[in-house]
């Protein structure tokens, strides 16, 4: 199945790139017909969405089999978390999401891949920005627990999720209440696979509309 996904994704990329290039050329033309301009805009948005889906499929396929390059170095999770959070200020502000960050003064030093850890944080925060109930708080805790570093993300979902955390992690499975939001639904699955190739663990807990993601990594000290 993984090989099939990879092959199909590669086969789609070539004609899709051609479509995107032609749409770009059309957008540069001086078109007076407002309906035609609107159609071109739809083509541009949907082709970009399809491109992102293909990229997610390829990454999910590689990550699920562990077929990714991993360069482990000593990192401080708290610093990288704060940096990634800073990139979401604008998105969270649009939904009036208030981040409550509770970060330990202790260093959370782990052996991990900087690029993959960033992608894990990015996918989790992107999921929150899409599905969290507007005008609510997002709680993020980063702490030491024995020989482990733990980072948890908690938010209130827009709608109750009538599935378990395990079901949500299944590829291509998303709660019915989320289907009106664009996206591949692969973000958390990719985050889980990338966490595991770095010897970490990602768990999801769902209780009604309460959504929690917890990351655990062995401390390198």
Residue ranges and their predicted role:
Residues 45-50:
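Short alpha-helical segment of the dimerization/phosphotransfer core of two-component systems
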Residues 65-70, 109-113:
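Conserved micro-motifs of the catalytic ATP-binding
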Residues 71-85:
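A conserved beta-strand-to-alpha-helix junction within the catalytic ATP-binding
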Residues 71-73, 98-108:
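Conserved catalytic submotifs in the C-terminal HATPase_c
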Residues 97, 199-202:
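Conserved glycine-rich
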Residues 105, 160-173:
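Short conserved segment of the HATPase_c
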Residues 127-129:
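Short helix-loop "hinge" at the ATP-lid/N-box region of the Bergerat-fold HATPase_c
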